[in-house]
Curated annotation (Swiss-Prot):
Any GO molecular function: ATP binding
Function: This protein is involved in the repair of mismatches in DNA. It is required for dam-dependent methyl-directed DNA mismatch repair. May act as a 'molecular matchmaker', a protein that promotes the formation of a stable complex between two or more DNA-binding proteins in an ATP-dependent manner without itself being part of a final effector complex.
NCBIfam families per the UniProt record, alphabetical: mutl (TIGR00585)
Species of provenance: Chlorobium luteolum (strain DSM 273 / BCRC 81028 / 2530) (Pelodictyon luteolum)
GO cellular component terms, A-Z: mismatch repair complex
Family the entry assigns: Belongs to the DNA mismatch repair MutL/HexB family.
One family name in Pfam for this protein: DNA_mis_repair
Coiled coil residues, start to end: none
Protein name per UniProt: DNA mismatch repair protein MutL
Length: 626
């Protein structure tokens, strides 16, 4: 007698269920895909006991004939394809034909279905994959699938389910994802007889507000671009919406929910320094591509896909997101304002154009046209890394006669400066424009924040992180140029390092020289500081050096930053003016000038906000003015 035997169908189905059905959310996913593929425009999801007791999906799709209904519960029976080549033109979510067979083998399974022209509905019941009843019943057109007592006959699987809160959380996240991917479908979710949502319209922003709170959609940026290979559309969030986890990042390929490491990494890199460490931006992005150029049959749960040319996808995806991020004003509002990306009303949300000299009076305090940055420039920065040569130029530091040297106005921006200077006093009476000849109002609050009157209300700037942003970009530019900008000390300063400090010093000493530090070895684990960058405060040279090394080591341990990026961040953090330091009016004005000459004036290198704005409309609302 042979030792190898063919497994009975019910045993094979139970084994297959181990891959297809991992938890109640897996059941929901497979049944929702079938409901969507049936052409339904109304789907209800009913859950009890986090899916352990009941999962029921009701749709108003095409329904099935008796023959199709019986075949649907057989393994490898599907209406989605006939040949392996059909995978190249697949337009459905499901295609393997094993979901219902696997689900019915580990549950008490009931299928009700009626085609539009059928007089009655058909009802089929299965227990552990074995048919136990077939009957005719009254019912509406469409299909209803009920899955009770999941894993009742596989106690080991049932035992390893998580808490109700965890299992229900997976179900809710799944239904939310599908409801965002298919706004044309009316979605209803009931959990333990409580209705959680019932969407009757196709308004995507209304759904986002329902899921994330009123006003959430106001903090989104719309994205849309396409070429012959790929289309990208959807929404990304302001940095204020950043999350601890990546659960609120939705990627859809031809409206199929997927997970893709390349897309996640490119999204994170596009935001770069706008994010606080370990935070992730919100994203709801739909990618459209020829089905023949993407393989969806690479994961048991169909969550992963493989592109035939991943490089081309990445090369288009990153610049589109980077452009949307770069052209937008990410300064947070103190209260919820208007929608941030509306056609015809985005001048107030596009951000400040780089300024210099006296430019803050005409640029920082006015609403300006968006920055013109090409896709080529954006892709160049992605391709070449954080210190590539294609980055937009950052103004070179000037002399050290003031605390914050004023950068020169780039020639390409002089026209914008002139335009805004000429229009500065043309606003209507009461519009918040300064009278001709008056300087914009600036106040220092508790020697920590700068409060500025702007055309639309007021702006609050954190002086420490603002200076940190200025110093960071200046340090990056100096190290890229490899032309040290050093000021020699009249009296060199000696620094003695501890062993670990000296190890770090040896690692970064070449980049310290590029940054502007002129250093000479002086005995064992000691150096003489003979020159420093022009931004280093007199008398703080030795302290700054040791603080930088400590900061560098901490960043290397926690964040694993690229060496020069780490050094630039350590230098700017330790050398920036501190909260509590009083500034003169000239220093405040110069700091603002320098801030708005940077590429990213809205966040410090570590992702903290630099600017918060409050509009007159918000103030009027708080004081009860109509």
């Amino acid at each position: 007698m042979p030792s190898i035997a063919r497994l009975p169908d019910n045993v094979a189905n139970k084994i297959s269920a181990g891959e297809v059905v991992q938890r109640p959310a897996s059941v929901v996913k497979e049944l929702l895909e079938n409901a969507i593929d049936s052409g339904a425009d109304r789907i209800s999801v009913v859950i009890k006991d986090a899916g352990r007791e009941l999962v029921r999906i009701i749709d108003n799709g095409r329904g099935m004939s008796r023959a199709d209904a019986l075949l649907s519960v057989e393994r490898f029976a599907t209406s989605k394809l006939r040949d392996v080549d059909d995978l190249d033109t697949l337009g459905t979510l499901g295609f393997r034909g094993e979901a219902l067979a696997s689900i019915s083998s580990v549950s008490h399974f009931e299928l009700r279905t009626r085609m539009t022209d059928a007089p009655v509905a058909l009802r089929f019941r299965y227990e552990g994959g074995i048919a136990v009843e077939e009957s005719e019943v009254q019912g509406e057109a469409g299909t209803s699938v009920s899955v009770r007592n999941l894993f009742y006959n596989v106690p080991a699987r049932r035992k390893f389910l998580k808490s109700n809160a965890t299992e229900y959380g997976h179900i809710f996240e799944l239904v939310r994802s599908f409801s965002l991917a298919y706004p044309e479908i009316q979605w209803q979710l009931l959990n333990d007889d409580q209705e959680l949502f019932n969407f009757r319209t196709s308004d995507m922003l209304e759904r986002l507000d329902t899921f994330y709170g009123k006003g959430f959609a106001d903090s989104l940026i719309e994205v849309g671009e396409e070429n012959d290979y790929l289309s990208i559309r959807g929404y990304i969030g302001r940095p204020a919406l950043q999350k601890r986890k990546k659960l609120d990042q939705y990627f859809f390929i031809n409206r199929r929910p997927i997970q893709n490491r390349m897309l996640t990494q490119a999204l994170q890199q596009a935001y770069a320094e706008l994010l606080v460490e370990r935070q992730a931006p919100f994203a709801l992005l739909f990618l459209g591509i020829d089905p023949s150029r993407v393989d969806v049959n690479v994961h048991p749960a169909k969550l992963e896909v493989r592109f035939d040319d991943e490089r081309s996808v990445r090369n288009m995806f990153y610049p589109v997101i980077k452009r949307a991020v770069t052209l937008h004003d990410f300064s947070p509002d103190l209260a919820a304002g208007g929608r941030t990306s509306q056609a015809g009303d985005d001048s107030a949300s596009r951000g400040f154009t780089h300024a210099g000299g006296g430019g803050f009076r005409t640029l920082a305090f006015q609403e300006v046209p968006e920055r013109a940055i090409t896709t080529g420039e954006l892709y160049g920065s992605y391709r070449e890394g954080a210190f590539g040569s294609s980055r937009p130029a950052v103004p070179q530091p000037s002399h050290q006669e003031v605390m914050f040297p004023v950068p020169e106005v780039p020639a390409a921006r002089e026209d914008i400066s002139q335009l805004l200077r000429s229009s500065m006093h043309e606003g209507p009476e009461g519009a918040g424009v300064e009278p001709k000849g008056e300087e914009p109002k600036i106040w220092q609050l508790h020697n920590k924040y700068l409060i500025c009157q702007i055309k639309t209300g007021l702006m609050i700037i954190d002086q420490h992180v603002a200076h940190e942003r200025v110093l960071y970009e200046r340090a990056v530019e100096v190290m890229e140029s490899r032309v040290p900008n050093s000021q020699q000390l009249l009296f060199p300063q000696k620094v003695e390092f501890r062993p670990w400090e000296y190890e770090v010093f040896e690692e970064i000493k070449d980049d310290l020289y590029r940054l502007g530090f002129n250093l000479r070895s002086f005995g064992t684990r000691a150096v003489m500081i003979e020159g420093v960058p022009q931004d280093v405060r007199p008398g703080s040279e030795a302290t700054i050096m040791q603080d930088m090394i400590a900061e560098y080591r901490e960043n290397a341990t926690r964040l694993r930053l690229e060496r020069r990026d780490n050094l630039a961040k350590s230098y700017s953090c330790r050398n920036a003016i501190m909260a509590g330091q009083k500034l003169s009016m000239g220093e405040m004005r110069t700091l603002i000038d320098n801030l708005f000459a940077t590429r990213e004036p809205y966040s410090c290198p570590h992702g903290r906000p630099v600017i918060i704005k409050m509009t007159l409309t918000e103030l009027d609302h708080m004081f009860g003015r109509s």
